[in-house]
Amino acid sequence: MPTWHYSVRVDEEKSAKAMVWDAPISYKKIVELARLLKGMKVDEARRFLERVARGEEPIPVRRYSGKQAHHRGLAAKYKWPIGRYPVKAAKILLRLLDNVTNNAEVKGLDTERLRIVHIAVHKGRVLKRWMPRAFGRATPKFKKYSHIEIVVAEEE
């Protein structure tokens, strides 16, 4: 059985960690949203993710932006007009944010002063399935997974 560690070392007394292993979402759909959250306060990140999960606020898509639509307000806020509404990714990150907040509360940290100091998304496994089609062809039905880790710390 393989072991897995966090990709950053932090002070254990002043920080809290959480991870999601094999989240049922593609890497390219969640990595842009995770990149936006780094450096935010936990309460601010929660409000932002709730707006994204309701489909009220788009996020900029810089890396995997092929054939993506332009959205109003993105160019003014992020200096990038291409974006999307990752509702499923926002819901997964909201659950992860709740987990790390609960971990911080158990450790005795002040949850009002928590800031996201590290968030990383790693590619997970791919379940490769094939759907048979006519004339001997087959269509791929791949299910992609991701691993997400988050570290929050109390700011002074």
Curated annotation (Swiss-Prot):
GO molecular function, one term: rRNA binding
Stored InterPro entries: Ribosomal_uL22 (IPR001063), Ribosomal_uL22_CS (IPR018260), Ribosomal_uL22_euk/arc (IPR005721), Ribosomal_uL22_sf (IPR036394)
Superkingdom in the source lineage: Archaea
SUPFAM superfamilies in alphabetical order: Ribosomal protein L22
Keywords on record: Ribonucleoprotein, Ribosomal protein, RNA-binding, rRNA-binding
Any one of the GO CC terms: cytosolic large ribosomal subunit
UniProt KW NAD keyword: no
Family indicated by similarity: Belongs to the universal ribosomal protein uL22 family.
Name this protein carries in UniProt: Large ribosomal subunit protein uL22
